[in-house]
Amino acid sequence: MSEDWKKKLNIPKKDTRPQTDDVLNTKGNTFEDFYLRRELLMGIFEAGFERPSPIQEEAIPIALARRDILARAKNGTGKTAAFVIPTLEIVKPKVNKIQALIMVPTRELALQTSQVVRTLGKHCGISCMVTTGGTNLRDDIMRLNEPVHVLVGTPGRVLDLASRKVADLSECSLFVMDEADKMLSRDFKSLVEQILSFLPQNHQSLLFSATFPLTVKEFMVKHLNKPYEINLMDELTLKGITQYYAFVEERQKLHCLNTLFSKLQINQAIIFCNSTNRVELLAKKITDLGYSCYYSHARMKQQERNKVFHEFRQGKVRTLVCSDLLTRGIDIQAVNVVINFDFPKTAETYLHRIGRSGRFGHLGLAINLINWNDRFNLYKIEQELGTEIAAIPAQIDKSLYVAEDTSAVPVPFPLDTMQGNARAAQQMPHPQQQAQLGGMPQPIPQQIQPPLAHQQAQPPPQVYPPQMYHQGIPPQQFANPPQF
C-alpha cells in the first residue's frame, strides 16, 4: 500500500511525556495490521494515535471477527478506542439505520464517547448521535428523522426512544456497554434488559469495565454467546499514579488544601467530595482563597454540567470540584492531580476516582485527606486493591507527576456533539450553601505545612490564575456570602 496518503494527514504534535507499561507492554502491532479501511486509519492518526495499546491489540481483531467480548482493563488504558475503532469499521455508511448502540452510565461519558466516535470516524461518512436524560426529548426525536448510524446514550433515554418506536434498533447488530459493572448495577440493570429486547437476537455484544462483579458474570451467562474474555488486570491501580494520604482533622482540611495548592505544580486537578452540598461549599471556599474553580454534580441542570465539562476539558479552568458524577471513564489527559477531599467509602469508588489522573500510561498524583474515622477504610481499600497509600512527605518529587514538556499534553476536541439540544447556559450556577465543611482552618501538622500562598514572598504558582481573570465561578456571585 502506498504511504503517500499519510503525508497529507494533519497529525498533531507528538506526546513526548513518559508512559508506563500499562500502555507500552504491547505485542508490537500497528493499526494497519488490523486491515482497517483507509478513512478510519486517517481519523486514527489525525487524532494522535500512534500504536494500539494492549487492550486495543486484544479487543480490536476479536471484535472485527464479530465475536462477543468481555474485556477487563484498567481505567485510562484506551478502552474507549478499543470498542469505537471496530464499531466504525463494522458500520456501513450507506445503510441509513442505527447499526451500533453504545451504552454508558453518565451523561458526561456519553458526550465524551460520542466525540471519540466523531473524531476517529470523521472521514468515514458515519453519523453519530448522542442522547441522554436531562435534554430536550423533542430535539432527539427530530434528530432521529435524519440518518443515524451509531447511537451513544444513557439507558433511560435510549429505552424511552426505543419504546416510542422513534429509535429503530431492529437492525442494530452491535451492542456495546462501557463501564459494564455500573451499567449492570441495580440502577440500570432492568433498563438494559428491556433495551436488549429491541435488538436483533443475533447481535454482537462488547462489554468493557475495570471491575467485574457477580452481576456482570450473570449477564454474560444469560446474554453473551461464547464470549472471548480479556483480562489485563495484573494489578488494579495504574502504575503511573503515586498515592499519598494526609492525616488531618475535618476543620483542618481547607487549610491543608490551600497548602497543597501552594506546594504542588498542578496542571489540572479534580477534587472529589462525598455530597453535592459539600461540592458547592468547597468550590465557594476555594474561590474565596483566590483560586479559580468550577464545580459539577448531579443536581445541576444538564446544560450547566455540559458547559462545566466542556470548559474544563479545554483547560479554561484548572480546578474542578465534583461528586462521583465524574469518576466513570472521563478522560482529561491534562489532569495530573486528584485530591480526595472526602475519602471514598468503597474500593471501587476510590479506584475510579484516582483513575482520572495518570491517563494512558502517563504520570499522576492522588492525595487523600483522611480523618480519624477514615483510618479503617483506608486500610480496607489498601487490602482490597493490593496497593499502598503512603503518608505524604514534606516534599513531593515533581518527577512523579509533572511532565517535563507540558506543551505535549494533548488538548481535547471541543464537545460539540449534543445535536439538537439547547446550548449550555452562559452563566455558571450560583452555589447554594446548605452544608458546612467545618470551622475556620487550624494549623496542620508540621510535616505538610509550608507557608500559605498569601504569606509567600513570591506570588502563587502561575498554574493557578487569580479569580480576576474571570475563570471559574464569577466573584460577583459571592458579593454577600453567608457567614460560616
UniProtKB/Swiss-Prot annotation:
It comes from the Eukaryota. One of its GO terms (biological process) is regulation of cytoplasmic mRNA processing body assembly. ATP binds at A73, K74, N75, G76, T77, G78, K79, T80. Pfam families: DEAD, Helicase_C. It catalyses: ATP + H2O = ADP + phosphate + H(+). Residues 60-230 form the Helicase ATP-binding domain. A motif (DEAD box) lies at residues 178-181. Its EC number is 3.6.4.13. Residues 240-400 form the Helicase C-terminal domain. It is found in: Cytoplasm, P-body. A motif (Q motif) lies at residues 29-57. Keywords: ATP-binding, Cytoplasm, Helicase, Hydrolase, mRNA processing, mRNA transport, Nucleotide-binding, RNA-binding, Translation regulation, Transport. The Q motif is unique to and characteristic of the DEAD box family of RNA helicases and controls ATP binding and hydrolysis. ATP-dependent RNA helicase involved in mRNA turnover, and more specifically in mRNA decapping by activating the decapping enzyme DCP1. Is involved in G1/S DNA-damage checkpoint recovery, probably through the regulation of the translational status of a subset of mRNAs. May also have a role in translation and mRNA nuclear export. PANTHER family: DEAD-BOX ATP-DEPENDENT RNA HELICASE 50. This is ATP-dependent RNA helicase DHH1.
